[in-house]
Amino acid sequence: LLITAMIGLRVPTARLPAERTTATADTAHSSSIGSRAMRAADVAAGAIADVDVAVAVLDRVTGDVVGNGQATGPMFSASLAKVVVAVDVLDRRRSDALPLSASDVELIRRALGPSDDSAMNDLWTRFDGMGAVGRVATRLGLTDTAAPIEPDIWGWMTTTASDATRLLAYVAEMPPPDADVIIGALAQAPPVAADGFAQDFGLQAPGIRDVTAAKQGWMRWRTDTAYLHSAGFVGADRRFVVAVLGRHTFPDPDWQTLRRSVTMAATAAVGVLRGRIGSPGAGQLAVPNVHLPGVVAHLH
């Protein structure tokens, strides 16, 4: 998603976490596995200067969400917006009898796995993407998720790491036919996206085990700010949801620094969670990550 900024449009920036249900590094219980994973990710990300990394971990067994100091700070969503639209369309098919053809479902799969922007453009236009953001945010209690200020640019939807974990946790609880569409597409995401961008970073980085499905996102704002996000499920039972949202502001683009920071945070979090994840069971996804060598190509 190539972004050309509108003059005078305010860019979302990190802010101190508001009072809400997400526990921060200072308030999370020290024995919580999610808290330990979040802290490890925060420390790993902090090893690289000048990169803002928001980290949140949700435990679907306890319902706890823990995040670092930036976990409730809004950032541009980039392609994480595709999950929101997919949830809305499938929910409306089930609750409102929204007509949905097999080709429409294939659009959802293409928008999620290969992260095909043309498929998302069709979904956004035909199925009221702007309204989808509000409907899903209200239904799921995503209080820090908002529709884009420019209606035609879905990547300008704003969200947070904490809200991203809640969104994916909801996906895991959807009826199997709907959950399978979303999670199945994410689990089969290729290492190189439809636009040629290498998706093998964060939770999809080579060598990271036990990530069953993840959505990646990337975009560039003006000439000096890049966003790189990775959010997904850890464990065959999908007990944990991890979201790592990264932002790097720089005079000259340095995508490798941002990729390294997001990947280090994701690797650290998964490493801590590995001891608590379930083994594959009947009907559960256990898709290994398969990656091809690649470098950053363009912006998404």
For each predicted feature, which ranges?
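Amphipathic coiled-coil signal-relay and dimerization helices
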Residues: 63-70, 212
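Hydrophobic alpha-helical segments that drive targeting, anchoring, or assembly
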Residues: 67-86, 104, 122-123, 154
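Short alpha-helical patches at coil-to-helix transitions and adjacent helical residues
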Residues: 80-83, 113, 117, 158-165
